[in-house]
Swiss-Prot record:
UniProt name for this protein: Imidazole glycerol phosphate synthase subunit HisH
Main location: cytoplasm
Keywords: Amino-acid biosynthesis, Cytoplasm, Glutamine amidotransferase, Histidine biosynthesis, Hydrolase, Lyase
PROSITE patterns for this protein: GATASE_TYPE_1
UniProt domain Glutamine amidotransferase type-1: residue ranges: 2-208
Lineage per the UniProt record: Bacteria, Pseudomonadati, Pseudomonadota, Alphaproteobacteria, Candidatus Pelagibacterales
Catalytic residues of the enzyme: C85, H190, E192
Length: 208
């Protein structure tokens, strides 16, 4: 099986690479690339994302044909894709970090700044927080409800269709921290920084 972690110059993704390689061992071939042909021929794709919504979208668009190839992989061919942090946020139609920016539009919705309730909640939201699993999800197999995952973000994805939400976390409000829509999976938290439970989520994705 071939799995591609998309490297589109969106910040340091070494921890994502290391975690996937640790779980994959020699059973899965992990490629780290933005090569369009390698993405097309992959069985699964991982879309990481660090930085702002706009900077990540701009970095994707800067590589000729990458967005079209990801659309073909995910929407047309319906192969499994996992978005992590801003990788998940880019599923949205629009993001409002820095300026209004068009997302990939795979899951209708928007990305807005977390309401800190007059500085009652610190932003960015950094650290371990409990997740509330709200529907059965393939990537949560073997993960207990109320498990703790690691977060670093100031913006939240608000999908129009609430049925895609697989988990939330309570920080200022019920923030979406995981989605599943057919072959599209996303986590707002960082599985690669979430210790053994995070590695289990990576394993579940690789086992799809």
């Amino acid at each position: 099986m071939n799995v591609t972690i998309v490297d589109y110059n969106s910040g340091n993704i070494s921890s994502v690479i290391n975690s996937f390689k640790e779980v994959a061992k020699d059973k899965v071939n992990i490629e780290v690339t933005s090569d369009l042909n390698k993405i097309r021929s992959s069985d699964k794709v991982v879309l990481p994302g660090q930085g702002s919504f706009k900077s990540c979208v701009d970095a994707l668009n800067a590589i000729n044909g990458l967005v079209e190839t990801l659309n073909e992989f995910t929407v047309t061919n319906k192969k499994p894709l996992l978005g992590i942090c801003v990788g998940l946020q880019m599923f949205a139609d629009l993001g409002y970090e820095e300026t209004e920016t068009k997302g990939l539009g795979w899951i209708s919705g928007k990305v807005s700044k977390i309401d800190n309730q007059n500085n009652k909640f610190k932003l960015p939201h950094i650290g371990w927080n409990e997740i509330n699993i709200v529907k059965e999800s393939k990537i949560f197999e073997g993960i207990k409800n109320k498990s703790h995952m690691y977060f670093v973000h100031s913006y939240e994805f608000i999908p129009d269709d609430k049925s895609v939400i697989s988990a939330t976390t309570d920080y200022s409000s019920n923030i979406v921290c995981s989605v599943e829509k057919e072959n599209i999976f996303g986590t707002q938290f960082h599985p690669e920084k979430s210790d053994k439970l995070g590695l289990k989520i990576i394993e579940n994705f690789l086992n799809l």
